[in-house]
Amino acid sequence: MEDSNTNKDINTNITNDDDDNKNINNNNNNTEEDVTVERILERKQKERESKLASMMSHYHQKYSSPSSLLSSPISSNDNNNNNNNNNNESFDINNTSYNGQDDQDEMDDFESEEYKQILLKRKAALAAKKKESLAEQMKKYNQQYDSIISGVNTILSPPPSSTTSNSSTSNNSSLNVSPVLFSTTSSSKLQSLNNNTSPSTSSSNLIDSTNVQTTSTTTAATSTSTQFTNTNINTNSNTLIENSLKISNENNNELNEQLQQQFILQQEQLREQEELKEKLQQQEIERMQTERKERELQQQKELIKNATLDNQQQQQQQPQLELQQQQSQPQQPILLPPLIFETNDIPLLTNVGFATLKNIECNAIKCSEEVVLLTKTLHQSLSTITKISIELFETFNGSTEVTCNAIGYSVNETKTMIDKCFELNNHTKSVISLHQKIKTVRDQLDKFDQIIHNAIKQMNKT
């Protein structure tokens, strides 16, 4: 029996040794297979990382500077090359035993985000260009307007003459005031336009800088992530993309807040400037009216004086002219008809000239006054329209607030009424229960009365 037990033990030990050898062989085979798989994965990972680095360097070189973004639009060849590269990568990955579809999807997402950033940059640049073109057009319109006003002033100004030098200078000074009013308003509009365009351009530049920083950080992250495995690359790329999006959103929010604050300050400054301009314009108009009245009186006095002096000079010159004609007649061998300029030009044309100049000056003054009055009425009408619109908007806001308050008050009142109704319902329930109890008590009292009445009858009978 002992020999049989020892043989069994030996056989069991031998079988255990065989099993151990098989397990060792299997482990060796598994380790060899794992090594080959790891080598293949490392080789494919290195290929992918090299392709990623080359693509990111290409994009970084192409889109790092804003001038290259504006000058070089995305062509169809670049898109085709990118598509071919993506197709080649997918083909190589599918041929291997390792499935790298997740990496490819992440690459596509990353490229689409870069493309979106590039499109945003281009849109900002186009908006800045449009605003600059609008500002240039406004400048051109203002220059044309100033040239038209100067032409009108030159047409309205009377011709220079020796006798009416003072009047002509006064009229020119009175007529040259109107362009100043128009030029101030136009310059203020141009300043406001330039101020409105400047924050947009600065914001576009800031957005460009932030986008360039995000692209540089992503390229650095991809270059450093070549040392890690596939899972580390995926997590790093996701975190970097999320961080870049958060940073860009925060920067955009800060820029929007700054732009809103600047816009509010500009509006307040413009309102103050407009109020000051209105006051100054009213003062200037009043001063102009008083000065014009004084000038008209002075011009009339000067015209009367000049007319009297001219008449006296004509009366004094007539006998001298007659003597000169008498002296010149015997000297001339051939009698010629008298010249018009020698006999009738000076006395007749002086009176007519003064009258025409007076009419021209009066018409010019009336035209200038009408232009000033028209501008004043237009300005007043515009100011009244703006005030009315502001008042209407304020009344609308007030009415909306009142309606909202009324609705809230009515809702609260309805709630209180509903609560009171519930309370009344509860009270009525208690009253009904009391009424029922009273009925039962009455019934019992009636029964008790009947019993007593019956007892009394029996007592009487007995």
Swiss-Prot record:
Pfam families: BORCS6
Bias kind Low complexity: ranges: 64-95, 190-208
Coiled-coil spans in chain: 119-150
Keyword Coiled coil in record: yes
GO biological process, one term: lysosome localization
UniProt feature, compositional bias: Basic and acidic residues: 36-51
UniProt GO cellular component terms: BORC complex
Spans annotated as Disordered: 1-108, 188-208
Keywords: Coiled coil
PANTHER family in alphabetical order: BLOC-1 RELATED COMPLEX SUBUNIT 6
Protein name as catalogued: Uncharacterized protein DDB_G0284127
Organism: Dictyostelium discoideum (Social amoeba)
